[in-house]
């Protein structure tokens, strides 16, 4: 779809605008999830409206209103996905359209569409300042966001590292599957194993034989959709609704698959803990049970070199809510060390989705433990990585984290954060949480405004 759009943009197309409209309609009617729509739809709209503006002297109120609706629809798709692809460009176009419309037409449009509106000028100011603060370009320009890979490791490293984590010799791992020579060559990257042989080795190491999967191993698209809804319910802290959704999912997934069972147990543990149905100690045990669906490793937290799946990382980071003392510190350090190592070799953009979740959890625990400077450093590193990937769904949370840790540090030195700074940062939190439709947090920040 992106290549088709690029052909339209840079080719000699007499019906450029019509083809852009066809692509918009196709994206809306085709089977695309929110993330995929956010990646391509705003780009189509941006180039469509950019071309339209060349003819703005011929616009009438109907054309202006239609273009405004198209622009707002593209921005709303970004909001649903928590992304900022072409956001600044679209906001500038929206402002430009509003400035050319008659005042009464603008008023009428706003009155008809007042529900959940965003203030374009206010939002663009916050977005631009945020990107400037973290030294990330605000405009898309020649960004290659379509072509990023996620959480990619060399198979030779996965086999070697995971085998060491399980404490297995090469002979023990390949027993009944393949020759030691084949495994040795695979661990050195000297050969590509047959798919079925590799799948059996990975299964023995607690890994899926599939090269790629999302939250669950299934071919049922409805299950994937339900899992996405479940994640939204948890993000919105609708835990009782999420629990019902999880029960509905349970009957539709194969729990004999270790990764699916791990997903279910991890979600069940989290929801029961958040609803106060289990103690901290019970919660840690439940997360440990979920983790051990795929990983049973002695002295895991003290290992220097590890390979963990994203779901295993989430099981471990969830456990921090119930841990204390040395065990918690070792666990946090293990995960942060894993990401630091990965970033050196691949960059954080390839691991950003779970990195955001993990750093948020780590910062909460470090801040509560009085490690405010380290917590702020991690938050700032995470914000920069998220902005670079055009992801802003939890930026509001991290801005508030930084403010909270700053308050604690100032209090230790006998000082206090000024009301002006408090209100400025809280307003940023309000605007960003509203943008990503996290209304629970938006209301929390509003209550804290002095």
Where are the predicted features?
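Helix-turn-helix/homeodomain-like alpha-helical modules used for DNA recognition
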Residues: 219-276
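A short, Lys/Arg-rich alpha-helix, primarily the initiator
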Residues: 138-165
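Short coil/turn connectors between adjacent alpha-helices in alpha-solenoid helical repeat scaffolds
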Residues: 4-19, 50-67, 100-119, 230-240, ...
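DNA major-groove recognition helix of helix-turn-helix/homeodomain DNA-binding modules
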Residues: 194-213
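Amphipathic alpha-helical segments of tetratricopeptide repeats
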Residues: 21-32, 68-80, 124-129, 243-254, ...
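Alpha-solenoid helical repeat architecture
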Residues: 1-2, 30-43, 81-89, 138-139, ...
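Short alpha-helical DNA-recognition segment
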Residues: 164-185
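"A position-specific structural signal for the A-helix of alpha-solenoid helical repeats
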Residues: 2-6, 42-50, 89-100, 158, ...
């Amino acid at each position: 779809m992106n290549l088709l759009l690029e052909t339209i943009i840079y080719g000699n197309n007499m019906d450029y605008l019509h083809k852009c409209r066809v692509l918009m309609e196709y994206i809306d009617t085709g089977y695309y999830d929110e993330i995929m729509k956010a990646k391509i739809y705003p780009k189509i709209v941006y180039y469509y409206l950019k071309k339209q503006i060349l003819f703005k002297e011929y616009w009438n109120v109907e054309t202006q209103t239609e273009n405004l609706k198209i622009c707002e629809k593209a921005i709303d798709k970004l909001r649903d996905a928590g992304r900022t692809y072409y956001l600044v460009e679209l906001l500038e176009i929206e402002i430009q359209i509003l400035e050319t419309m008659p005042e009464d037409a603008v008023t009428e449009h706003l009155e008809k569409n007042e529900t959940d509106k965003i203030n374009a000028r206010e939002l663009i100011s916050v977005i631009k300042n945020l990107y400037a603060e973290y030294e990330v370009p605000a405009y898309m320009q020649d960004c290659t966001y379509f072509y990023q890979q996620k959480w990619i490791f060399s198979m030779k490293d996965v086999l070697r590292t995971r085998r060491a984590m399980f404490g297995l010799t090469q002979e023990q791992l390949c027993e009944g599957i393949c020759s030691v020579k084949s495994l040795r060559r695979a661990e050195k990257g000297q050969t590509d194993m047959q798919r079925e042989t590799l799948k059996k080795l990975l299964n023995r190491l607690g890994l899926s034989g599939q090269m790629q999967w999302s939250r669950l191993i299934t071919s049922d698209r409805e299950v994937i959709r339900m899992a996405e809804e479940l994640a939204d319910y948890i993000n919105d802290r609708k835990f009782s609704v999420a629990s019902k959704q999880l029960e509905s999912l349970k009957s539709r997934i194969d729990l004999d698959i270790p990764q699916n069972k791990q997903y279910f147990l991890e979600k069940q543990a989290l929801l029961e803990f958040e609803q106060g149905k289990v103690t901290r100690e019970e919660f840690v045990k439940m997360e440990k049970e979920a983790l051990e669906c795929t990983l049973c490793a002695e002295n895991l937290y003290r290992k220097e070199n590890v390979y963990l799946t994203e779901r295993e990382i989430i099981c471990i980071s969830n456990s921090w809510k119930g841990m204390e003392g040395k065990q918690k510190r070792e666990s946090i350090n293990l995960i942060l060390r894993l990401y630091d190592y990965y970033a050196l070799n691949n960059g954080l953009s390839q691991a950003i989705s779970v990195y955001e979740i993990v750093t948020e959890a780590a910062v909460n625990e470090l801040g509560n433990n009085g490690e405010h400077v380290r917590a702020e450093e991690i938050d700032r590193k995470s914000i920069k990585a998220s902005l670079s990937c055009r992801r802003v769904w939890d930026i509001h949370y991290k801005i508030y984290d930084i403010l909270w840790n700053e308050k604690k540090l100032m209090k230790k030195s006998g000082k206090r954060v000024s009301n002006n700074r408090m209100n400025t940062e809280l307003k940023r939190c309000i605007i960003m949480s509203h943008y990503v439709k996290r209304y629970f947090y938006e209301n929390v920040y509003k209550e804290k405004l002095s």
